[in-house]
Curated annotation (Swiss-Prot):
Molecular function as annotated in GO: GTP binding; GTPase activity; translation initiation factor activity
Cross-referenced InterPro entries: EFTU-type, P-loop_NTPase, Small_GTP-bd, T_Tr_GTP-bd_dom, TF_aIF-2_arc, TIF_IF2, TIF_IF2_dom3, TIF_IF2_dom3_sf
Keyword Manganese belongs to the record: no
Highest taxon in the source lineage: Archaea
Gene Ontology CC annotation, any one: cytoplasm
Name of the molecule in the record: Probable translation initiation factor IF-2
Species this chain originates from: Pyrobaculum arsenaticum (strain DSM 13514 / JCM 11321 / PZ6)
C-alpha cells in the first residue's frame, strides 16, 4: 500500500447560497497557512492539508479535543460545486465522494436545488455536514474575520443569538421532513444519528474553522480507513470533464482515486458506444503556487501522478468520452480485455435497454444518468431505457411501445440535454410527452403531475365505457304513456341513470331508457335524488310488466359488474355501490 489519501469533499446547495465563495474561503485558508512545498496543486480540485487546518483553527482544535487525533492528510475539495460534479464522482457500487457539504442560506432555508442536492446525497449514502451560510446577514451579528463560530456566538447580543436560534430551528424542522435529524454541531451528542449544522459566513470567514474541524471529525467517524488506502498499481479513476484545448486536442480532466497513472499508459474509459481505449501522450498538472510567475504559464507536464490526484489527460482516442465514465490504466496489453470488460460491465449497469414497461431517461453524463435512474427507482418509477445524450427517434418508438402497457410510461425524461427539433416533432405527433429540465426533482414532480393527469384521463375513458349502477322508482300518478314507448315520472333512489341503459325488474329486463327530461328539457343523466321523466323502449306496458311504485335497477353486464367490484370500486359513490349490490342480489334471486 502506498498510504492513505485525503477524503474527496463536494460542496452542494441551491444557486446563490455562497458555494463558490465558501470554497474560495476554504482554499484561501490553505494558501495562507501553507508551508513551503506542502501544497500540491490539482486539476479540478484543491488540497487543504490538515496542518493548515490546525494552524487556521487555532485554539478551537483544543476546545474540540482534536489535536493529535486526526489521521487524514487533509481534504481534497472538488473545485466545481453542485450536483453535476457530485453525480459524476461515481464508481461501481457507490460514490467517489467521501464527504459532502450542503450549503444552505440560513436566512431562507432549504430551496429547490438544495432539496435536490440533499436527495442525491441521501441516495448515494455519503456522510455530510450542513453549512448554514450567510451568518453575517443575521440582524445585529458582530463579525470578526475568520473567527470560529463557537467563539463568535459568545460575543453576540442576545437578540442576534435569538434570531440565529430561530433560523436554525426552522432549518431543523425543514430537514425533519426528509427524515433527517439535525442540530447545531456543538449540541450533537450522537453523530451517527444527527447531522451537524455549522453556521458560517463565506464573506467574513466566520465558522470556516468549525466547518473544517467538524468535517475532520465526521470523516474519521464514518469513512473506513480501508476506503482511503491507495495502492501503487495501475490507476483507477473517473472522468470529470471532456473538452477541446487549443494545441492539445481533446483532453479529459480526471480524478485518480487509486494507483498511479503514467505517461505512455493505455487507459480504458467509455463513450456513448461503450468502452474506449486511449494512449496517454501527456499528463498536465498545475505548477506549485510558489512557481506561478505568469498567469498564462500555470501548468506543467509530469511523468506520472499518484492517487489521490486531479489531472488533465492528453491522449489519442478521447473523442466521444463522456463525463462520469470510469477510467482504468492498463500496464500490460494482456490486461486490456479484462479492463474493457470491467468498464463495459460498469457502463451496462448505468445504461438500461429492456422491453419491460417504464419511462425513457436521457441525461448529459454517465454520472447524472446514474443519479437520475437511482432517484426514479427509489421513487418507485420503473425505467425501460436509460442512455446518455439527446433523445432519439428510437426513444420515441420505445416510449410508444411502453405506453401500450401503461399510458403513464409514454414519456421521455430528459435531464440537462437538448431536444433535437425533429425528435420533438415526432414525439408531439406520436403523443409522447418530453419532460426536460436541469433540476432532477422538478422533472420528477412534473412527471408525477403529468402521470396523474394521464391516469385520471385513462380512468375516465375506461369508466365512460362502463355502465354505472342505478336504482329508480316509478312515481305514482306520473304515468304519461303506458306503452310504445312508456313515459313515466321516476325518482332516482340511488346511483345514476343515462339514456341507453337497460332497466330490470326482479332481475329481468324490461326495456331501455330512450330519453331523460328534467323540467321539460332533455338531460344526459340523472343522479340520486333527481325526479325526472323517462321514456322506455321495449316490450313493456305499464300495468303489466311494470306498475306505479315499482323499483327498477340499471342492468350492469356481469363482466362490467366484476370490473366495478374488483378494479374500480373506489370510483363509485356509496349510493352507487348500494345500487350495484342490490341489483346483483336481484339477478341472483331471478336465476335461482
Amino acid at each position: 500500500m502506498a498510504g492513505v489519501r485525503s477524503p474527496f469533499v463536494v460542496v452542494m446547495g441551491h444557486v446563490d447560497v455562497g458555494k463558490t465563495l465558501l470554497l474560495d474561503k476554504i482554499r484561501g485558508t490553505s494558501v495562507a497557512y501553507r508551508e513551503p512545498g506542502m501544497i500540491t496543486q490539482h486539476i479540478g480540485m484543491s488540497f487543504v492539508p490538515w496542518q493548515a487546518v490546525e494552524k487556521f483553527s487555532g485554539p478551537l482544535v483544543d476546545r474540540l479535543r482534536l489535536r493529535g487525533r486526526i489521521w487524514i492528510p487533509g481534504f481534497l475539495f472538488i473545485d466545481t460545486p453542485g450536483h453535476a460534479a457530485f453525480s459524476n464522482l461515481r464508481k461501481r457500487g457507490g460514490s467517489v465522494a467521501d464527504l459532502a457539504i450542503l450549503v444552505v442560506d440560513i436566512t431562507s432555508g432549504l430551496e429547490d436545488q438544495g432539496v435536490e442536492s440533499l436527495k442525491l446525497i441521501q441516495s448515494r449514502g455519503v456522510p455530510f455536514v450542513i453549512a448554514a451560510n450567510k451568518l453575517d446577514r443575521i440582524y445585529g451579528w458582530k463579525s470578526v474575520e475568520n473567527r470560529p463560530f463557537l467563539f463568535a456566538v459568545e460575543d453576540q447580543e442576545w437578540h442576534a443569538v435569538a434570531t440565529l436560534e430561530e433560523r436554525i430551528g426552522k432549518l431543523i424542522e425543514e430537514l425533519s421532513k426528509f427524515g433527517i435529524e439535525a442540530d447545531r454541531y456543538d449540541r450533537v451528542r450522537d453523530f451517527t444519528k444527527q447531522v451537524p449544522i455549522v453556521p458560517t459566513s463565506a464573506v467574513t470567514g466566520e465558522g470556516i474553522a468549525d466547518l473544517l474541524l467538524v468535517l475532520a471529525g465526521v470523516s474519521q467517524r464514518f469513512i473506513p480507513k480501508e476506503k482511503l488506502q491507495v495502492g501503487e498499481g495501475p490507476a483507477r479513476g473517473v472522468v470529470m470533464e471532456v473538452k477541446e484545448e487549443r494545441g492539445l486536442g481533446v483532453v479529459a480532466d480526471a480524478i485518480i482515486y487509486d494507483g498511479r497513472l503514467r505517461k505512455g499508459d493505455v487507459v480504458v474509459t467509455a463513450g456513448l458506444e461503450g468502452p474506449k481505449e486511449a494512449k496517454v501522450r501527456m499528463l498536465i498538472m498545475p505548477k506549485p503556487l510558489e512557481e506561478m510567475r505568469d498567469p498564462e504559464d500555470r501548468f506543467m507536464a509530469v511523468e506520472e501522478v499518484k492517487a489521490a490526484a486531479g489531472v488533465r489527460i492528453v491522449a489519442d482516442g478521447l473523442e466521444g468520452v463522456v463525463a462520469g465514465a470510469p477510467l482504468l490504466a492498463v500496464w500490460s496489453l494482456q490486461d486490456l480485455p479484462n479492463a474493457r470488460r470491467l468498464v463495459g460491465e460498469e457502463i451496462s449497469e448505468i445504461k438500461i435497454e429492456s422491453d419491460r414497461e417504464g419511462v425513457i431517461v436521457r441525461a448529459d453524463t454517465f454520472g447524472t444518468l446514474e443519479s437520475t435512474v437511482l432517484f426514479l427507482r427509489q421513487q418507485g418509477v420503473p425505467v425501460r431505457k436509460a442512455d446518455v445524450g439527446p433523445p432519439t427517434h428510437k426513444d420515441v418508438v420505445e416510449a410508444v411501445l411502453s405506453r401500450r402497457k401503461n399510458p403513464a410510461f409514454g414519456v421521455i425524461l430528459a435531464f440537462n440535454v437538448k431536444i433535437p427539433p425533429d425528435v420533438e416533432k415526432e414525439a408531439t405527433s406520436s403523443g409522447i410527452k418530453i419532460i426536460r429540465g436541469e433540476i432532477l426533482y422538478r422533472i420528477f414532480d412534473e412527471y408525477l403531475k403529468w402521470s396523474q393527469e394521464v391516469k385520471t384521463k385513462t380512468i375516465e375513458q375506461i369508466l365512460s365505457q362502463l355502465t354505472r349502477p342505478g336504482k329508480i322508482q316509478i312515481l305514482p300518478g306520473f304515468v304519461f304513456r303506458r306503452s310504445d314507448p312508456v313515459i313515466v315520472g321516476v325518482k332516482v333512489l340511488a346511483g345514476t341513470i343515462k339514456p341507453g341503459v337497460t332497466l330490470v325488474k326482479d332481475g329481468r329486463e324490461v326495456g331501455k331508457i330512450m330519453q331523460i327530461q328534467k323540467q321539460g328539457k332533455p338531460v344526459n343523466e340523472a343522479a340520486v335524488g333527481d325526479e325526472v321523466a323517462i321514456s322506455i323502449q321495449g316490450d313493456v306496458m305499464v300495468g303489466r310488466q311494470i306498475k306505479e311504485g315499482d323499483v327498477l335497477y340499471v342492468y350492469v353486464p356481469d363482466e362490467q359488474a366484476r370490473e366495478w367490484l374488483f378494479k374500480y370500486k373506489q370510483y363509485l359513490r356509496d349510493d352507487e355501490k348500494k345500487a350495484l349490490e342490490e341489483f346483483l342480489k336481484t339477478r341472483k334471486s331471478a336465476h335461482q
